[in-house]
Amino acid sequence: MIDEDISKIAETLSKEEFKLNNDERIINALERIATSLEIIAHNKIHNTKLKNNANPISSNNVFNSINNDSQYIENFLMKKGVTIKFVPEINSEINDVLYSLASFMGNNYSKISSVYKAIKSRLSSGESVKIDMKNFTQEEISYSCQFCHNLYELTFLDYYKYLKSPKYQIILAPNRIPLVINFLTGHWLESYVVYEIKKLINYFNIKKEVSFLLNPQICLPNGDDFELDILFSVDDNIYWIESKTSDYHHYVEKYSKVAKILNSENLHPYLLLTEVPQQTCNKLTNLFGMKVLNIENFSEFLFRELEQYKTHIIPEEAYNVENNENE
């Protein structure tokens, strides 16, 4: 009798436990459905903005005051036995608005990296993601929310919602148009580099000849095809900057070999990484003979590098690209 009662109690408890687990699953499912419905509702309104603002071209392009005659750089490459196969036109979609966004990302990367990587992981599917920020610092929460707000305003996010205390969560879904995918998967970092260069050229009021060659597709002397990220020259010096937002392991040696082919006292090759501490960057520099930089130190490094060409420093408000409408 006692055994039978124990068996019944155990069976009842088992059913209750299943019910609780099942209820929890139902609640979670309902939350996901509610989020999806909210996203769909927002998309109907937000996609109207997208159609009108997918390509908001600003008249104040950051290249306006730069001589973009890249002949000096091209001649240098040809003397090294390099054939230039194709040079794309400057991407008109990467206008001042996106350069400003790239600058925000680059200068605050450590504070927004968790949210950025969560967004990037959903670009292929467009699915929503819930980001728990309970362990974030207040600064990380603030900058992450600002980052998402900026993306949403530009229609880079189809959906964005911030849940305040006690949840401290961000729910978002990325837009999957080509401009967004291209920019957030890595082109933002190139844009950040170009933006910082331009800003410092203005800041130091550099009068030397300055030119850019962006994303040229080349053929090396051994017949291998290759694509360079950013080449820019100041006077007789040429700076070559490659940038990687993710796995760099398969590229460092390739870049090092190309640097040896292009070797010259006038060439300064650099590799910019986002996910690698400067201590590791220093080790890579010593190992491969190519200067490797962490994004946290890039702006300061570039400042010191371009300072040598300064004519005189002009007031900050005059070189701030975001606010200077007459460059």
Whereabouts are the PLM-identified features?
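Intrinsically disordered, low-complexity Ser/Thr/Pro/Gly-rich regulatory segments
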Residues: 30, 48-327
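Extended alpha-helical segments
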Residues: 1-52
